[in-house]
Amino acid sequence: MQKPDFMYLKNLTVPIVLLDTYCDFPNVDCVMINNMQGAFNATVRLIHKHIGQPGYLHSSYPIHSFEERCEGFYRALRKNGLPSSKSVVHLLSPSVEGAYADMLELLEQNTPLASCYFADNDNIAIGAMKAFQHKGYKIPADISIIGFDNMPLSTSVIPALSTIHVPKQNLGKTAAERLINVIESDEYYSVKIEISATYIAVSYTHLRAHETLRHL
């Protein structure tokens, strides 16, 4: 959702809890993933593993959660003394098919590449990965990628994708509990709740099964 989409919420008098979306209206509660922290941790992991400047597979479509992940990426660079201007950034559509087409076009233009990337979501990561593989790059031997969201597709691609896990059940449970609390309470105060995301690495068993794979 974008800012204009929220306007119809402004004058509603019923309890409102948004899930994984931020809105600054005083009558709206939000339960969100800590996107900034998840992206920060993923980027720091890439920096420490690859001892270099990670690239960024950034969504070409503006979404608030992606902008928070963008801030986490650049904050990790600054924290580790790396210049933001030297990171390779590719703007890709936030779908597997769109990211694949966009990345393939960039590769055909001989666009400079990084040795590792953080991606705004798993769809972008997987689409880019397929484009790299189409052009003969080995994943992760030549290029490593960490996605975000831990979508089911991340474990079915070869090689499997390391990603940031979003605890969807906990997210929904927290939102439902907050909504019930608002309904039953006599007084109201707006809250914005953030839930931590965690890193999910490719398992050792999977590494043994696929010789091209190495742990990020």
Regions found by a protein language model. Name each.
Residues 1-44, 48, 107-108, 112:
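Alpha-helical recognition/docking segments in bacterial nutrient-uptake
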Residues 4, 30-41, 57-78, 82-104, ...:
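Hinge/beta->alpha junction and helix N-cap segments in small-molecule ligand-binding domains
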Residues 31, 105-207:
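Flexible loop/turn connectors
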Residues 52, 83-84, 138, 213:
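Conserved H-loop
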Residues 52-53, 115:
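Short acidic/polar active-site loop segments enriched in Thr and Asp
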Residues 205-215:
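Conserved small/polar residues in nucleotide/adenosyl-binding loops
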